[in-house]
């Protein structure tokens, strides 16, 4: 096995950048080549059908079943011209991946031959087996039917030879079994509530969009090195491995020159992403060695989520073509930065108003502050739920590790905006009236300047930071489906804006103007949500103590954090907005607990196997060599001289014996602990047992394996080391 390590290292050093075809057209010309966008709709659909479909997409009108066949026919013609032979309903089950079943267009023509057929019924609805996906007990094998249904708001696209149709996925009884269904409901609820609030300032607003711009971090590892690490292959992260002498301490990788092989991968990925309509914009080296980032231009939230799921799939495919494996795990390597996926979230209206951006008039700035303060209220009221929405067995390794935001949700506003809110908090009604009437002179600034975008500092320790015209939800994990965080955030915002509208309407009277009522409510909210505002160092121990005093959720146990989904406030929020029922929430939590347990269980099995079948045999083999050396020294030299010569080897022999004995014992203990945990019927209690008992054992065993790596002869060590995984590019 050690020879495999050196063979793959040698091959990785010799691998050259892969050549690939680059389109002759400009990116703007081949953008969306494989997407059935409006340009294609106009070309392939009758005029009246095109108009009705656009109405469905833009205004949420009900899909007229009478046009489904014509839409399907147009899609089929377009897709077949691109070489498509199959179609699939492309959906996002609760696996945090995507699912698809490919069916061919061909059907019997009734004359002994075949023809291509794709009907409106096949476009609009399919029936996957719901019991074979995570469902939290909603579906059983004997009641397996589920439905996938077309989402017209996300355009269909062609990948290879398959027409992919974005769909929702629900059970036979109507419960959602995916991420898209509650996301669409959350966006609808947020839109309704936000439009009502916008009408205080602009009655012409008809729709409010939630926008998302994600930043996808990832690692690239040579495919041969990856294959020689069973832990990477099976769990997505290294379960053992001592830190390399050099990692990221020189701070020379961030924004550094992109390695040639990596640059070829990035360029190929970008071309294919642009052809699929994903507006990729940025690429660069990240902080850790062999860590990189990809980011697009922001898009409407539902489409942005679909594009992120598509890009992660595309990254895996393109990476293999270039001799890499892409690692999307939040913490694939110990001792260096993990990977996140910052979610840049904002709201905007159909007439072009950016609700999270300051304006030029007092009224525009009052609107701006209204949405900022309501966002803070939503985050404060549901800080535990927002943490649960981004928590997982994998992301838990990254959060709070002095490289990523802490596992305590707080919001950074920056000095300038904080001063504005602090002033409003202590203002009188008369002061606030002057604010509206005289362009904010009472705030000691004539207006909140557009340059606020540049005047807002960056606090990298904040999990939910205002960055000038949007909030950046930094706690989201690199492997996660963004929909989870966006469902929680947009639903919380919908509930909060609804409550704000009620409070303002109640405050308005003959003697209280609309503007004064708004400011009175905002002042009360600013006081209420003040605990969520924190501009200091989120990594500090002092903040943890302060956050607890403020009443923020400071829980760190992943399975316990999931309880937030079933809290009274969360259930009320999701049910009152129509986003999810209590049954759906209970099912999702069961899936979360089961997934957590299974991931720790897999890691424990893999580590136990590697420890007993790779590490211990190699260590004892090296120990035998040392023992033989000691005996030979005693044969060649007198006792006192041999004792001095062999002292170091005897010390190593003893240390190897102690560490291998510890590893064996703790692997046995871990097996027994799993047996005990597996007998627990309650899924929550089982997940807690795995968190409290088995997860710590992984680190204990790893500690001794990593110490052995420093002792055992490098030529005998079978697994690629960190210096090889991270610095061969």
Feature map (PLM): residue ranges:
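N-terminal hydrophobic targeting/anchoring segments and the immediately downstream early-domain regions
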Residues: 1-24, 141-157, 162
């Amino acid at each position: 096995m050690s020879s495999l390590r050196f063979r793959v290292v040698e091959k990785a050093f010799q691998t050259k950048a892969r050549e690939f075809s680059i389109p002759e057209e400009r990116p703007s010309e081949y953008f969306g080549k494989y997407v059935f966008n409006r340009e294609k709709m106009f070309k392939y659909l009758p005029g009246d059908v095109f108009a009705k479909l656009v109405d469905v997409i833009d205004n949420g009108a009900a899909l007229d079943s009478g046009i489904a066949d014509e839409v399907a026919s147009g899609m089929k013609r377009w897709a077949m011209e691109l070489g498509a032979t199959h179609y699939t309903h492309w959906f996002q089950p609760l696996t945090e991946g995507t699912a698809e079943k490919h069916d061919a267009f061909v059907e019997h023509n009734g004359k002994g031959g075949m023809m291509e057929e794709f009907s409106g019924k096949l476009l609009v609805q399919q029936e996957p087996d719901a019991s074979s996906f995570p469902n939290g007990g909603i579906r059983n094998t004997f009641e397996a039917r589920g439905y996938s249904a077309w989402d017209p708001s996300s355009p269909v696209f062609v990948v290879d030879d398959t027409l992919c149709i974005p769909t929702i996925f629900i059970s036979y009884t109507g419960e959602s079994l995916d991420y898209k269904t509650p996301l669409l409901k959350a966006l609808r609820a947020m839109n309704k509530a936000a439009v009502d609030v916008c009408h205080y300032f602009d009655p012409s607003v008809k729709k409010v969009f939630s926008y998302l711009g994600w930043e996808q971090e990832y690692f690239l590892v040579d495919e041969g090195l990856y294959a020689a690490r069973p832990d990477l292959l099976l769990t997505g992260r290294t379960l053992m491995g001592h830190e390399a002498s050099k990692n990221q301490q020189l701070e020379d990788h961030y924004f550094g020159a992109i390695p040639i092989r990596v640059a070829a991968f990035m360029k190929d990925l970008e071309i294919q992403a642009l052809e699929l309509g994903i507006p990729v914009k940025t690429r660069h080296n990240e902080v850790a060695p062999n860590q990189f980032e990809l980011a697009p231009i922001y898009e409407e939230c539902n489409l942005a989520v679909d594009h992120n799921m598509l890009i992660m799939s595309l990254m895996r495919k393109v990476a293999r073509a270039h001799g890499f494996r892409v690692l999307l795990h939040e913490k694939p390597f110990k001792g260096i930065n993990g990977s996140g996926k910052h979610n840049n979230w904002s709201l905007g209206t159909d007439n072009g108003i950016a609700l999270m951006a300051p304006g030029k008039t007092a009224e525009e700035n009052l609107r701006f502050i209204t949405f900022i303060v309501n966002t803070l209220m939503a985050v404060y009221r549901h800080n535990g739920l927002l943490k649960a929405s981004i928590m997982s067995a994998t992301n838990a390794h990254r959060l709070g590790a002095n490289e990523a935001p802490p596992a305590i949700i707080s919001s950074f506003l920056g000095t300038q905006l904080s001063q504005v809110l602090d002033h409003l908090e202590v203002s009188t009604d008369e002061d606030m009236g002057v604010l509206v009437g005289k362009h904010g002179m009472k705030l000691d600034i004539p207006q909140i300047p557009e340059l606020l975008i540049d005047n807002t500092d960056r606090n990298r320790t904040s999990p939910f930071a205002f960055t000038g015209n949007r909030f950046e939800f930094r706690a989201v994990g690199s492997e996660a489906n963004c929909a989870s965080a966006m469902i929680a955030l947009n639903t919380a915002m919908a509930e909060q804006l609804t409550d704000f509208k009620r409070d303002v309407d109640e405050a308005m009277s003959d003697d209280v103007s609309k503007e004064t009522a708004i400011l009175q409510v905002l002042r009360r909210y600013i006081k209420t949500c003040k605990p969520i505002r924190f501009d200091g160092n989120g990594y500090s121990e002092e903040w943890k103590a302060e956050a607890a005093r403020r009443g923020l959720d400071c829980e760190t146990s992943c399975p316990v954090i999931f309880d937030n989904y079933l809290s009274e406030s969360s259930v009320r929020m999701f049910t009152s907005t129509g986003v999810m029922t209590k049954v759906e929430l209970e099912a999702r939590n069961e899936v979360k607990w089961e997934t957590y347990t299974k991931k720790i269980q897999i890691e424990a099995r893999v580590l136990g196997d590697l420890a007993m079948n790779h590490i211990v045999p190699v260590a004892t083999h090296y120990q035998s060599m040392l023992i033989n050396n000691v005996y030979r020294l005693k044969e060649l030299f007198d006792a006192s001289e041999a004792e001095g010569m062999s002292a170091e080897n005897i010390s190593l022999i003893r240390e190897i014996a102690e560490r291998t004995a510890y590893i064996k014992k703790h692997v046995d203990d871990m097996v027994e602990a799993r047996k005990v945990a597996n007998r627990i019927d309650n899924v929550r209690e089982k997940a807690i047992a795995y968190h409290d008992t088995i997860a710590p054992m992984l680190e204990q065993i790893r500690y001794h394996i990593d110490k052995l790596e420093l002792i055992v002869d490098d030529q005998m060590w079978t697994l690629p080391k960190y210096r090889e995984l991270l610095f061969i590019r």
